[in-house]
């Protein structure tokens, strides 16, 4: 179920402050965040965030298509190593 429109999008407060500080500075550095639950807002377009996936910070460059999505959607937490091969078919 989607979030109520009257509540507005959820964004951690510290994230807005970090984004404003990054916009003010001319350096383009990765902003490390742990808030996978925060919604991507239009103010974040053009910035690069390091979204923590439980192991490392995955760099995510925010584009206009990402607005309204959550940061966690772009930083997978699980690694798929493939299914095991069928040993009976290989035996010959």
Curated annotation (Swiss-Prot):
Keywords: Ribonucleoprotein, Ribosomal protein, RNA-binding, rRNA-binding. GO terms for molecular function: rRNA binding; structural constituent of ribosome. GO terms for cellular component: cytoplasm; small ribosomal subunit. It comes from the Bacteria. Belongs to the universal ribosomal protein uS19 family. Protein S19 forms a complex with S13 that binds strongly to the 16S ribosomal RNA. One of its GO terms (biological process) is translation. PANTHER family: RIBOSOMAL PROTEIN S19P FAMILY MEMBER, SMALL RIBOSOMAL SUBUNIT PROTEIN US19M. This is Small ribosomal subunit protein uS19. Pfam families: Ribosomal_S19.
């Amino acid at each position: 179920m989607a979030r109520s429109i009257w509540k507005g999008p959820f964004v951690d407060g510290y994230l807005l402050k970090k984004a404003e500080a990054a916009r003010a500075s001319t350096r383009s550095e990765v902003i490390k965040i742990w808030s996978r639950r925060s919604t991507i807002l239009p103010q974040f377009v053009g910035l690069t965030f390091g979204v923590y996936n439980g192991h490392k910070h995955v760099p995510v460059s925010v584009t206009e298509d990402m607005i309204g999505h959550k940061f966690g959607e772009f930083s997978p937490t699980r690694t798929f190593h493939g299914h095991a091969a069928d040993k009976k078919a290989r035996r010959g």
